[in-house]
């Protein structure tokens, strides 16, 4: 059985990871232009499309997430991220890359909703404020760290390295959630 503090940190890391997924590949957008040989407009459209889908997921699932099995929904979201990260890492076809990236946004949109629900369920009235504060800390670190991590991985291994990294982390998180 996992200690409740460890669970809270896992949930915080899930929030961090969801935000990381959104922001990690922006530093290599010019390289994607070279790799895929498509107009920069279409590469930028994957960024805007990703954000739009995450927002839609929040609206669509936001009202009903409390009535669903949180663990199954979270595993579904992580499963979508795993599959889409794998496809993004191995494809050399931009259309497949873009579609997979947009599916990745569906999984990414699920994660923070379930995380907040579980944080509320796992924390007591007295600890809820601290749990939410820690959640916000994790959440706000990702936009600062994602471009650094993305440019480091991208400089060495291009987009393949970035999406392979996301694949490995999402598999680890899936296994942790599955077994806890």
Model-found features: residue ranges?
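Extracytoplasmic
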Residues: 7, 13-33, 38-40, 58
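Residue-level signature of mid-helix packing/kink "hotspots" within the transmembrane helices
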Residues: 23, 51-59, 143-144
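Paired small-residue
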Residues: 84, 95-103
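Helix-loop-helix hairpin linking two adjacent transmembrane segments in secondary transporters
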Residues: 134-178
